[in-house]
């Protein structure tokens, strides 16, 4: 079997195609969440704590010297990325919770199977023994 044919069979399996679609949707969803955090959530949060823009939070480790740029640790951007992550994680959690709930509804409990001949016979024997014990 040629490598191209093997790859084609691998790529056309349902799982791989589903995974590719999931990655594409996830990337688009990530952009939406990043915009939500940067443009919708962080500005009012910054206003609530005194008009602060989180992107501006930074610590300069070394000042610029001539042509060498300053070494800066931008922890405000990190805080914003943490918000991004938390929102994405919560959205994924809720989606999985919804999917699990829908799957549980699909899996209706199966009706109890009809008793086998042996079970019916044993039940009759039990009932007869109870009857005999009650007479005694």
From Swiss-Prot:
Single GO MF annotation: mechanosensitive monoatomic ion channel activity
UniProt record similarity statement: Belongs to the MscL family.
The name this protein goes by in its record: Large-conductance mechanosensitive channel
GO CC terms in record: plasma membrane
Record membrane topology: Multi-pass membrane protein
Function comment: Channel that opens in response to stretch forces in the membrane lipid bilayer. May participate in the regulation of osmotic pressure changes within the cell.
Localization annotation: Cell inner membrane
Source organism: Escherichia coli O127:H6 (strain E2348/69 / EPEC)
Chain ranges passing through the membrane: 10-30, 76-96
Main location: membrane
Quaternary structure and partners: Homopentamer.
Keyword Kinase (UniProt): no
PANTHER family, A to Z: LARGE-CONDUCTANCE MECHANOSENSITIVE CHANNEL (PTHR30266:SF2), MECHANOSENSITIVE CHANNEL MSCL (PTHR30266)
UniProt keywords, alphabetically: Cell inner membrane, Cell membrane, Ion channel, Ion transport, Membrane, Transmembrane, Transmembrane helix, Transport
């Amino acid at each position: 079997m040629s490598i191209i044919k093997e790859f084609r069979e691998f790529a056309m399996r349902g799982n791989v195609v589903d995974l590719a679609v999931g990655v594409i949707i996830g990337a688009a969803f990530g952009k939406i969440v990043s915009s939500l955090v940067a443009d919708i959530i962080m500005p009012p949060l910054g206003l609530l704590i005194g008009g602060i823009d989180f992107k501006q939070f930074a610590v300069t480790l070394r000042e610029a010297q001539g042509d060498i740029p300053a070494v800066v640790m931008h922890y405000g951007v990190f805080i914003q990325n943490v918000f991004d992550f938390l929102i994405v994680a919560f959205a994924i959690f809720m989606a999985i919770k919804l999917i699990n709930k829908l799957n549980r509804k699909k899996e209706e409990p199966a009706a109890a199977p009809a008793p086998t001949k042996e079970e019916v016979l044993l039940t009759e024997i039990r009932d007869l023994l109870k009857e005999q014990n009650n007479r005694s």
